[in-house]
Amino acid sequence: MILTLALTASLVQQAAAAPPPAADYVPQRVFDTRSGAFIDFESMVAALAKAEVVLVGEQHDDPNTHRLEYALVSGLKRRRVAPTVSLEMFERDVQEVIDRYLSGAITAEQLLQEARPWPRYATDYSPLVELAKSEGWPVVAANLPRRFASEIAKTGESSIGQLSSADRTLVARDLQCPHDAYFDRFTSAMTDHSPSGDGKPAAPTDEQRATTDRYYWAQCSKDETMAESIARASEARAGRPGPVVHVNGAFHSDFGAGTAERTRRRLPGKRVTIVSILPVTDLDALAPAGDDLKRADFLVFTVK
């Protein structure tokens, strides 16, 4: 309890002390994969202002990435666009807490105590939430509660059917988890590729396959739930100009898969634009090619 209170106090102090990240220039280069050309950051923002959903794929815990996310959203504000901010980093069951904070009914300290923020919330996501609060924009707690994801990863998708009716509303109604290209990427990331005796990657055991399948179901459940949250937020805008800007780990939206594919399934005909932020060591040696051209509509390179 003492440790929890100390951590909360520390996060509150950090949130209060953190300067708006947009105040500093962030080295970056933007590549438009549709035109095959580098463009300036503001040209990208102008294009995003015309979208109905923008999915921003981030590398977690990268400071410049988070500054660019803030710059992107504040750029929409400069264009007199009032977006909805949607975050992977908050779970559906704390939506009421978020709403109470945005309305001024609770303090920042209470938000941190009740909303289970990520450890780097003060520096990485608080600026986005504070901007939304000051402008009166909605903030969507988009993700599946992590305790449900953990149970799915442990016991499989059957655990979803054992949820109470109230808890079931916190998980997407329509759940699809096909073994497609996204599954192949997920499996590649999950599987131990240590070589066998002949130097080739060792084939996964049945147990490893079963474990991967359970973890993939947890991943799909997150993607489906975030996509459903995004679709609901988009429909709630009732035709008002400007996008739902959803921030998630890049794996969830790169290559139009995961949350991106599931959002498009729910919003056919809507303009869904994907941004992928990529920290690199050298901005002067960029030559996007191959799979990177399929990764997103806009590639935003920044310095690690």
PLM ranges: what are they?
Residues 41, 45-48, 69-73, 125-129, ...:
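Extracytoplasmic/secreted envelope proteins and their assembly/folding machinery
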Residues 25-29, 49-59, 107-113, 209-212:
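Acidic/histidine-rich, surface-exposed loop or edge segments in extracytoplasmic proteins
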